[in-house]
């Protein structure tokens, strides 16, 4: 296919048009008085949202060169979302400001490579200073403030804070759609996995159709059990203790299952059999997790262990186990605290190393199950459109809160970026590198300008006053007052602000050093091509 090539100024101008088209659509959502954007959906009702990355992903421009510019800025939003989970609109606004200012200077004759060097220098200083003014997040109240600012909803803030308090910072918090109008929190304590009882005859509560075992022994194996003789020795030891048994195996069937059911019905012995969770290597890892949590051993031939010679000391313990048709929950496993902590650290290291998003998700689930539990925020709303918009906001708020716990918080509302302005301005460089520093300085003002603009105010006036205020004092666009931002709970996670600035500068520097852009030439529509002559088809009647 033939290619269309544009060079230097012409190429950069075309890409800038694309950058502006996308950024102008995204930046109207910034701040407490930001507006919404309506996105057309091929099927179903339109999506109304103020989430920067969702809007950025939807934008496709007809002109190939403009579209490339738009996609580069969409990449800034997407990368910031991946790293910090929020701050996508701020990142887009910063990128647009840097690209615009940068192109003005490059057009005027500045060397793009020198400009890039200055920008990198300025961003490094800005990030160091952001870390210096960052404050660690402490207590449920601070967590609630971060979440409330991100979701623009205090109720959501307190829900997320409660969820994090209940399941810990490593706990899994999932967001689901509810059928009701209200948003609620549901917490599953202990380790839960998605396998239920092997037979409904094993239930102890026939109303709820669940089996509840108090202080049970837990036998964990990766073998399939069909013959009761294999587990008879250990069963007899458990019966002597007068305790119930949870049997986790690859499968329990045939004579073994029948014997367990008959003994349960006769009241001789209470045992519940469940299949092991997961598949393949993940199953082995999950069985190992259960064994660490309960203080037992995995009876597997890989370790030279045999079911027939299993002793009661090799079984795990827990204060309670609840088994339903679909799930098994182990509460308060009797495992060694140090071993559990070591296992948690091992899984954390695997999370850091893995490149697969799916593997990372599964590892984080395992981490949460060992570390404390799972919380589910069930989002409710009056209409489907409102539900989708609310769900996106809560996801952002949750990501934002996690980022705050990780790296601390800074003053919100664009204040922190202006707070580091003077330190960046003090950096001295020569020639085009100084131009690069000036570009970053101008960009640092842009988020607060846009927040003020969206609130119907003049951004320049707000910026100039903010530069002369004490660090931490900022403009609350929601009320129009000058306040101590952290005291009022108007905060941003340091990680979000840092990621937005780094990613914006990275893409802006790349675009400024672009000298040629190559795109596919649009195909000419062959106007009257139609179908080839099919006159010979007339003779097909003879085929009948």
Swiss-Prot record:
Q: Cite the binding residues for ATP.
A: 29-32, 86-90, 413, 476-478, 492
Task: Provide the alphabetized UniProt keywords.
Answer: ATP-binding, Chaperone, Cytoplasm, Isomerase, Nucleotide-binding
Q: What is its EC number?
A: 5.6.1.7
Which Gene Ontology molecular function entries are recorded, alphabetically?
ATP binding; ATP-dependent protein folding chaperone; isomerase activity; unfolded protein binding
Spell out the Gene3D superfamilies in the cross-references: GroEL, GroEL-like equatorial domain, TCP-1-like chaperonin intermediate domain
Domain of life of the source: Bacteria
- On whether Transmembrane is a keyword of this UniProt record, the answer is no
Q: What Pfam families does this protein's entry cite?
A: Cpn60_TCP1
Q: Which reaction does it catalyse?
A: ATP + H2O + a folded polypeptide = ADP + phosphate + an unfolded polypeptide
Localization, per the record, is:
Cytoplasm
Keyword Thylakoid in the entry? The reply is no
Q: Which cysteines are joined by disulfide bonds?
A: none
User: Which cellular components does GO assign to this protein?
Assistant: cytoplasm
Q: What class of enzyme is it?
A: isomerase
- Entry's Gene Ontology BP terms: protein refolding
**SUPFAM superfamilies xref list:** GroEL apical domain-like, GroEL equatorial domain-like, GroEL-intermediate domain like
Summarize the protein's role: Together with its co-chaperonin GroES, plays an essential role in assisting protein folding. The GroEL-GroES system forms a nano-cage that allows encapsulation of the non-native substrate proteins and provides a physical environment optimized to promote and accelerate protein folding.
Q: What interactions and quaternary structure are annotated?
A: Forms a cylinder of 14 subunits composed of two heptameric rings stacked back-to-back. Interacts with the co-chaperonin GroES.
Its family?
Belongs to the chaperonin (HSP60) family.
Family annotation (HAMAP family): CH60
The name this protein goes by in its record: Chaperonin GroEL
């Amino acid at each position: 296919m033939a290619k269309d090539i544009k060079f230097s100024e012409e190429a950069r101008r075309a890409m800038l048009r694309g950058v502006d088209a996308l950024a102008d659509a995204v930046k109207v959502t910034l701040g407490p008085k930001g507006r919404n954007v309506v996105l057309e959906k091929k099927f179903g009702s339109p999506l109304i949202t103020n989430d920067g990355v969702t809007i950025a992903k939807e934008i496709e421009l007809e002109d190939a060169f403009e579209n490339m510019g738009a996609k580069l800025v969409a990449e800034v939003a997407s990368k910031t979302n991946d790293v910090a989970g929020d701050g996508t609109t701020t990142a887009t606004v910063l990128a647009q400001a840097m690209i615009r200012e940068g192109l003005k200077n490059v057009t005027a004759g500045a060397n793009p490579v020198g400009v890039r060097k200055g920008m990198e220098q300025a961003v490094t200083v800005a990030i160091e200073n952001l870390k210096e003014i960052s404050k660690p997040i402490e207590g449920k109240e601070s967590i609630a403030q971060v979440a409330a600012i991100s979701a623009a909803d205090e109720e959501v803030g307190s829900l997320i804070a409660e969820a994090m308090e209940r399941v810990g910072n490593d706990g899994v918090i999932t967001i689901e759609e509810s059928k009701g109008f209200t948003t609620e929190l549901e917490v599953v304590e202990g380790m839960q996995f998605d396998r239920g009882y092997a037979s409904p005859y094993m239930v102890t509560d026939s109303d709820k159709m669940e089996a509840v075992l108090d202080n049970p022994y837990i036998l964990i194996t990766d073998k399939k059990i069909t013959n009761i003789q294999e587990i008879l020795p250990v069963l007899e030891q458990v019966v002597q203790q007068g305790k119930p048994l949870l049997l986790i195996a690859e499968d329990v069937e045939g004579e073994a299952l029948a014997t367990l059911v008959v003994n349960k019905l006769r009241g001789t012995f209470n045992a519940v059999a469940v299949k092991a969770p997961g598949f393949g290597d993940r199953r082995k890892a999950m069985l190992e997790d259960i064994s660490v949590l309960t203080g037992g051993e995995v009876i597997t031939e890989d370790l030279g262990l045999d079911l027939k010679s299993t002793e009661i000391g090799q079984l795990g313990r827990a204060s309670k186990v609840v088994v339903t048709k679909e799930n098994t929950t182990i509460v308060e496993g009797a495992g060694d605290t140090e071993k559990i902590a070591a296992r948690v650290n091992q899984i954390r290291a695997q999370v850091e190393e893995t490149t697969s998003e799916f593997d990372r998700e599964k590892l984080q689930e395992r981490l949460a199950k060992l570390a404390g539990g799972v919380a589910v925020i069930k989002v409710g709303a009056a209409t489907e459109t409102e539900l989708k918009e609310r769900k996106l906001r809560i996801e952002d708020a949750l990501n934002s809160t996690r980022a705050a716990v990780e790296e601390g918080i800074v003053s919100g509302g664009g204040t922190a970026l202006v707070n580091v302005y003077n330190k960046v301005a003090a950096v001295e460089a020569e020639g085009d590198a100084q131009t690069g520093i000036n570009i970053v300085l101008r960009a640092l003002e842009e988020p607060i300008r846009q927040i003020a603009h969206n609130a119907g105010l003049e951004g320049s006036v707000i910026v100039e006053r903010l530069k002369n205020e004490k660090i931490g004092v900022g403009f609350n666009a929601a009320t129009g007052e000058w306040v101590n931002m952290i005291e009022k709970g108007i905060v941003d996670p340091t990680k979000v602000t840092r990621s937005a600035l780094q990613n914006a500068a990275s893409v802006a520097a790349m675009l400024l050093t672009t000298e040629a852009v190559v795109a596919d030439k649009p195909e000419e529509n062959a106007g009257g091509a139609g179908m080839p002559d099919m006159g010979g088809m007339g003779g097909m009647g003879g085929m009948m």
